Amino acid sequence: MILDTIEQVKIYLIQELLVRPEVSVHVEYLSGGVSCRVWKIVQNNHRWVIKQALEKLDVQADWFSDVERIHREHRVMKQIEFIVPDSNVPKVLHVDYTNHVYIMTCAEEGVETWKDLLMHGVFNVSTAKSAASILSQIHSQSYKIDEEQKIEFSDQNYFNQLRIDPFHRFLIQKYPELTANITKLIDELSLQRTCLVHGDFSPKNMLVQKNGEIVLIDFEVAHWGNPVFDLAYCLGHLMLKAWHLKKYEELLSLINTFLDSYKGMVLNLLPHLGLMLLARMDGKSPVNYIQDESLKQSIRMVAINWITNTSAEPNVLEAIEQQFQSISKV
């Protein structure tokens, strides 16, 4: 059963014996993602979120992924309970393997995504600190995960479908001169695997609560892999917000706090960060808020320069600051 409408969601809830037909239920579509249908359910004082995977993602290019990934997601969330505080990750309440659906707890009323806060000019360093702290815990404490689950999470099929293929391999088609460099980055992600990786560690997947703490969502790309991906992915989004908003000092402060609070060390971060920037310009899922062609070209130049970087491990914060200063003068 595909949950495309409010009425379909209500029928589904009744069929699954999750609500009684005579009881009023409020159903609201939650936007923001391209890979799933997500709905908020409110019944009396109870609030849940229902999520169903899409086979074809909602982007312009043809982009497909196995809907079984939704079950990887809720199993990862169950394991995360042993790593981070309960308040930082939703709890899984119901799983439906037939329709590729699961239901989880809903965040408190009034929360906003970190992305929305940034886009509205709210630059709170405590949010960056909270995000980095959660990521650090996931990376450093994931050795606690059940061994059988580690084996399952080592399968990178969904990661390939949702990240490597639409980002790295798609870029190779557009930039064949970067084939060797991008292939090296793919190899690092597939071979240097040391911990649980979120795979979609973006400000849009962080719900900021009233107390400033973050609720982390969207684990469908999670896998046992290289932690550099999560850092590059998040930093790329923060850099793009800086260029779009022209708030370089504010975003640099957030990036500095994020890197300082992470407290871990990853190798070869700058080339992976460059790849993320280029993917958000020319991959299968480019950001929709950067439209200025001259700015896009400047970002491409930064990205390619970093992807092809062969120098000793550079200071990432200094490299970001230099590019902010350079582009801010254009």
Tell what function each PLM region has.
Residues 1-11, 102-105, 137-188:
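Active-site catalytic-loop/activation-segment of kinase and kinase-like phosphoryl-transfer enzymes
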Residues 3, 35, 266-273, 314, ...:
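Phosphate/pyrophosphate-binding loops and the adjoining catalytic core of nucleotide-dependent enzymes
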Residues 28-43, 48-50, 184-229:
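Active-site acidic catalytic loop and adjacent metal/ATP-binding pocket
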Residues 30, 39-146:
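ATP-binding pocket architecture of kinase catalytic cores
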Residues 1-27:
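Juxta-kinase regulatory segment immediately upstream of eukaryotic protein kinase catalytic domains
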Residues 249, 280-330:
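ATP/Mg2+ or Mg2+-diphosphate-binding catalytic cores
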Residues 17-25, 74, 162, 179-191:
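Short Pro/Gly-enriched beta-strand edge/turn motifs at strand-loop
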